[in-house]
Amino acid sequence: MTSTAVLKAEVYKLRSLNSTAWLLGITALVSLTLSGVAVRSPMEGEEAGLSEVLVGPAFAQFLIMVFASRSATMEFRTGTIWQSRLAVPSWTRLLLGKAGVIAVLAALMGVVLAAGGVAVASVAAPDVDVVPSGGLEWRQLLTVPVALALVAVLSLAVGLLLKSGGATITVLLVWALVVEPALSATGDWLAGIDIGPWMPFLALSDFQGQSGGVSFPGGPYLACVYVAAVTAALLAVAIKVQGRREP
């Protein structure tokens, strides 16, 4: 089976699952709703703007994590992965194809959520200026698809390693919401090194220009390169482990 055929097969599998449309539909609905609500009800003392619009995509990131990890664990639970394995004798080609499709789909969702969030906010609060007006705001808006693609592949890799839907989602959420903030708050406890900026999700936040986070050494764009490298390494480990578990 050619690489193109592998990609087409992965797309077909996703389209054939009712859960795909439901999960992505719920993600879009929740994200766009949050964008509209946030821009109408900004935090006390703050003026509504693009940062409120991006509340929706920021929350949607966690739903994309669930979707991407489930795309891996569901196949092992239902056994459809073995049908694909018969057609594609290489775990590397098969899983790289899956990762590629998931990344593209997540990026497309990012485009929809970012553009849709601005559109919904413009309707919900027409007197609020939500159009990006500077370099930082444009970066905050345009990095949404990239961030969702990276998070999706990282979540897929964790799902391949654990194979359990519940365990994978738990690990991802605890990692992003508990472990990284806790380690960042402890400061330079590890041999005098502040490890907070080196946490993947925190580094990704710096790339996106989110306020209140940590600054990655070398700047936000290097942070993106770092997160991409971590994601690629984790995916490579997941593929290697899968090849050893079931050659």
Predicted feature locations:
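Secretory targeting signals
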Residues: 5, 18-70, 95-163, 174-185, ...
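Short coil/turn motifs that cap or connect alpha-helices
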Residues: 90-91
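Helix-capping/transition residues at the boundaries of transmembrane alpha-helices
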Residues: 13, 73, 84-86, 155, ...
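Membrane-interface capping segments at transmembrane-helix boundaries
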Residues: 237-247
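Transmembrane helix boundary and interhelical loop/hinge segments in multi-pass membrane proteins
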Residues: 47-49, 68-87
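A cytosolic-side transmembrane-helix exit/cap motif
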Residues: 102, 186-195
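Short, Lys/Arg-rich, polar N-terminal cytosolic tail immediately upstream
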Residues: 1-11
